[in-house]
């Protein structure tokens, strides 16, 4: 009798995705982040669901409802902080996952890569709207500043902003719709993640060497299920250390002050995972130019597969490209630091130089390094 795992229509899908999936035998821990992102997503949906049971999306009661969750709801504080810090863990895993894709040339799977970029944009939108919901000072002013950027779009900008606000300023209508979108988007992300996996399993996984591994495949279970469980345990360990010891480490103290449209905080800044993009936005003195740079800083990922000039897929055997990659990582860390600093000398010039470097490395230096390596190998 054939195993039900291989015959049942639903079980067959699960089997071909998580059990009998042929997997390269040499993939490293950098390939763990896909499953960790899945765990983060499930965790965020579950904690978010329980928070939504007690949250009210009204400007008069939103701040109080979050306080009520932390003070009066059974284990409300842990659910709230798991959700807030879970977002940080989500983005850490996302950045690692994208970095892995860039380093090992996984972006040559075009469909998988492009769905991944859409997933990144959807996750960023979800996180931004979630940050608005507690209705603290940084929530209100963050929403005001970021939505206002759309007014830089010629001709339709102002109308577009007022349409998104649902009025002439960030108010009750804005908060209500942000809550609605924040609730629905994770389910859209889940559907997109399934499409992401579908496209990945059409080609099979890449591996650190970038060389096709069809001759050397092993079943996903038990080899990589056990490896993923170890990764998940480490993820939950780090998350719970954050939640239980320093829950507000990555937050902004200004968000414990209720939103006040008459009082602007001294330094408006987003959550840490948006600071690199915020620094690029601020580095251009022109409003429309800044908005374009901000959008391009993310959409540049779509161009990466077309900028691949190397005869090799992975950077494993390409030392010059490796140097470029790690300079890019250092540059992104610099941008993240600058994004959290006030707009004054010397931070302005550092931010501008780091922004120029970011685009220069991806568009010019990396393809050039690949061409040099090809010539050195006489290819």
Curated annotation (Swiss-Prot):
Cofactor notes: Binds 2 heme b groups non-covalently.
InterPro entries hit by this protein: Cyt_b/b6_C, Cyt_b/b6_C_sf, Cyt_b/b6_N, Cytb/b6-like_sf, Cytochrome_b, Cytochrome_b_C_euk/bac, Cytochrome_b_N_euk/bac, Di-haem_cyt_TM
Subcellular location: Mitochondrion inner membrane
Gene Ontology CC, one term: mitochondrial inner membrane
CDD domains per the UniProt record, alphabetical: cytochrome_b_C (cd00290), Cytochrome_b_N (cd00284)
Binding site for a ubiquinone: 201
Residues binding heme b b566: 97, 196
Listed cofactors: heme b
GO biological process: one example: mitochondrial electron transport, ubiquinol to cytochrome c
Binding site for heme b b562: 83, 182
Transmembrane intervals: 33-53, 77-98, 113-133, 178-198, 226-246, 288-308, 320-340, 347-367
Keyword vocabulary terms for this entry: Electron transport, Heme, Iron, Membrane, Metal-binding, Mitochondrion, Mitochondrion inner membrane, Respiratory chain, Transmembrane, Transmembrane helix, Transport, Ubiquinone
Molecular function (Gene Ontology), one example: metal ion binding
UniProt membrane topology term: Multi-pass membrane protein
Miscellaneous comment text of the record: Heme 1 (or BL or b562) is low-potential and absorbs at about 562 nm, and heme 2 (or BH or b566) is high-potential and absorbs at about 566 nm.
Functional description taken from the UniProt entry: Component of the ubiquinol-cytochrome c reductase complex (complex III or cytochrome b-c1 complex) that is part of the mitochondrial respiratory chain. The b-c1 complex mediates electron transfer from ubiquinol to cytochrome c. Contributes to the generation of a proton gradient across the mitochondrial membrane that is then used for ATP synthesis.
Family, similarity comment: Belongs to the cytochrome b family.
Subunit structure: The cytochrome bc1 complex contains 11 subunits: 3 respiratory subunits (MT-CYB, CYC1 and UQCRFS1), 2 core proteins (UQCRC1 and UQCRC2) and 6 low-molecular weight proteins (UQCRH/QCR6, UQCRB/QCR7, UQCRQ/QCR8, UQCR10/QCR9, UQCR11/QCR10 and a cleavage product of UQCRFS1). This cytochrome bc1 complex then forms a dimer.
Protein name according to UniProt: Cytochrome b
Source species: Capra hircus aegagrus
Taxon lineage: Eukaryota, Metazoa, Chordata, Craniata, Vertebrata
């Amino acid at each position: 009798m054939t195993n039900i795992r291989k015959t049942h229509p639903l079980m067959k899908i699960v089997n071909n995705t998580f059990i009998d999936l042929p997997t390269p035998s040499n993939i490293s821990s950098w390939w763990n982040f896909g499953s960790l992102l899945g765990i983060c997503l499930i965790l965020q949906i579950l904690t978010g669901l329980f928070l939504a049971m007690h949250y009210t999306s009204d400007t008069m009661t939103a701040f109080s409802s979050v306080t009520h969750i932390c003070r009066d709801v059974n284990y409300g504080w842990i659910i709230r902080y798991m959700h807030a810090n879970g977002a940080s863990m989500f983005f850490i895993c996302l950045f690692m996952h994208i970095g892995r894709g860039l380093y090992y040339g996984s972006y040559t799977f075009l469909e998988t890569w492009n769905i991944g970029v859409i997933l990144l944009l959807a996750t960023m939108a979800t996180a931004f709207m979630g940050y608005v919901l507690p209705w603290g000072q940084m929530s209100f002013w963050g929403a005001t500043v970021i939505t206002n950027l759309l007014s830089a779009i010629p001709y339709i900008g102002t109308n577009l902003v007022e349409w998104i606000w649902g009025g002439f300023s960030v108010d009750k209508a804005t908060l209500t719709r942000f809550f609605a979108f924040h609730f629905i988007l994770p389910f859209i992300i889940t559907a997109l993640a399934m499409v992401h996996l579908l496209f990945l399993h059409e080609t099979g996984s890449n591996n650190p060497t970038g060389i096709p591994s069809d001759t050397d495949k092993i079943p996903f279970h038990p080899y990589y299920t056990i490896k993923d469980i170890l990764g998940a345990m480490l993820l939950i360990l780090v998350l719970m250390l954050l939640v239980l010891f320093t829950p507000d480490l990555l937050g902004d103290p200004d968000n414990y002050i209720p939103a006040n449209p008459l009082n602007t905080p001294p330094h408006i800044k987003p959550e840490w995972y948006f600071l690199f993009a915020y620094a690029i936005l601020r580095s251009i003195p022109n409003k429309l130019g800044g908005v374009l740079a901000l959008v391009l800083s993310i959409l540049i990922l779509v161009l990466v597969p077309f900028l691949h000039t190397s005869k090799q897929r992975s950077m494993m055997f390409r030392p010059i490209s490796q140097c470029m990659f790690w300079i890019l990582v250092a540059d992104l860390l610099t941008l993240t630091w600058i994004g959290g600093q006030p707009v004054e000398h010397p931070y302005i010039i550092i931010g501008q130089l780091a922004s120029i470097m970011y685009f220069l490395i991806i568009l010019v230096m990396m393809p050039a390094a690949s061409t040099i390596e090809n010539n050195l190998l006489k290819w």
